[in-house]
Amino acid sequence: YDRRRQRQMCIRDSNNTYRANDALSSMFMGALRSTSSALKIGLGGAVFFFVETHFSLPRWDSSSILTWIIAFIAYDFFYYWFHRISHERQIFWASHVAHHQSEDYNLSTALRQTGTGFFLTWVFYIPLFIIGVPSYVFVSVASINLIYQFWVHTEHVPKLGWFELFFVSPSNHRVHHAQNEEYIDKNLSLIHI
């Protein structure tokens, strides 16, 4: 593949971090994932409703800030375990590997998601419904986490000092995406380090 042609195909920015073919591939995968999200919402939603209705402890008070803080931290905890297993077990890795296949690291990489993840992800969040997290608190917290996940996929944000000691940042998420042996399967959390 001609490097000059590849440079011409870059979407211009100061670091040439967006090659058109890679960015378009990531965006196309994100669009495909969006269509499978309807299945995830339907399947997961039905199971969550059933668990919330039949097996849940008393529902937490959604007007309490403590409910939201605990739900936010608990969501990140269960995401960590989902993400860790996605790196350690082949059936999960087969679904997650697409996200790590981009040769570039930019915002479009966040969109590079598989369409098969819905088969596996929702299972990890069942405990939240068992302990009494209201479904609309869960949906809100999941949405905030999803938005947060987007911005950490960039090379354009420098190190953020003390922030990186507590929260996932673009810098330490770049380590997660690195292919160096010592960095593989590191920094698996979504929000908290």
Could you describe each region identified by the protein language model?
Residues T17-A20, P58-S62, A98-H99:
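Helix-boundary and loop/linker segments of multi-pass membrane transporters
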Residues R12-L24:
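Membrane-interface helix-loop junction between the first two transmembrane segments
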Residues L43-I69:
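Juxtamembrane/interfacial segments at transmembrane-helix boundaries in multi-pass membrane proteins
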Residues S14, G44-V51, I85-F92:
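Membrane-helix interface/capping segments
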Residues A31-K40, S63-I191:
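Membrane-embedded catalytic scaffold of the fatty acid hydroxylase/desaturase
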Residues Y1-I11, I191-H192:
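Single conserved hydrophobic/aromatic residue that forms the stacking wall/gate
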